[in-house]
Amino acid sequence: MIMCGITAIFNIHDGAQALRKQALLMSKRIRHRGPDWSGIYQGKTAILAHERLSIVDPASGGQPLVSPDGKLILCVNGEIYNHQELRERLKGDYEFQTGSDCEVILALYKKKGIDFIEDLNGIFAFALYDEEKGVYLIARDPIGVIPLYIGYDDEGHLMVSSELKGLEGFATHYEPFLPGHYFYSEDRKLTRWYTRDWMDYANVKDNPTDVQQLHDALEAAVKRQLMSDVPYGVLLSGGLDSSITSAIAKKYAAKRIETNGKADAWWPQLHSFAIGLKDAPDLLAARKVADAIGTVHHEIHYTIQEGLDALRDVIYHIETYDVTTVRASTPMLSLIHI
């Protein structure tokens, strides 16, 4: 998934201006993640940068986001699915500056301090800088849908980046920022914020199967992820997973979920996309599913040689040699270039 990109440098005690060039270079390395906007904020002890791919509020949702009093600065890569509910709850406590779904993070922090992450329903990696207090908070979503890496240099600077390449040459030590964790500068350590009973199989192994509950939960999950101010489509392989999620998306695509189905969507029909070798069985299956659910279907072919030629770029972007991930990502890179 390509979304926005964030980079940040914290623990700056010898003048942020000296590190501005580094911060810009870190952000430039991940600019492919955000073609719509590049932004940077330089504070007393931190620099935050953002590369934006617009999904919600394209006109005014540029980042870094800044609170009305100018004391809180935020960079986010992600989507907050329950932002409308949170806005309604917080509107008396915070003056929202944009329509961005991510601005609710600033409002929550202002009201609750760091004890708000459980309030978020979404996928995210964010860095929040409280300039007045001189502290910062970094967090990642429960299962790590959104990528984030953390690194340190020999001068004690802490850095984060959506991709490893943003830290290369600057950090002497770096590692993945753990899913479901946050880092608060006052604590100086990673802390798990997301924990559930079902993480221990012993707690759920005897639970009865409830097919209707599974159906309702899956449909609700797909529906809330259709929140968008720009056109969207579905990737359809013809397999069970993509067929089910595409069918659910098609069910709700005609109306804007942001209005609880009261307003028509801005695009008349859901488009589906499938890519593969010519005459591949998956393409045939995807075509059948598209016909059955009624999407405008696009079938793209690529050759084995084109796949081999793309390998270097694929590995550069996904930053892993894992065979399964490389195999799945190769046709996806060809698809997004069309």
What spans do the regions from the language model cover?
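Cysteine-centered catalytic environments shared across enzyme families
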Residues: I2-Y321
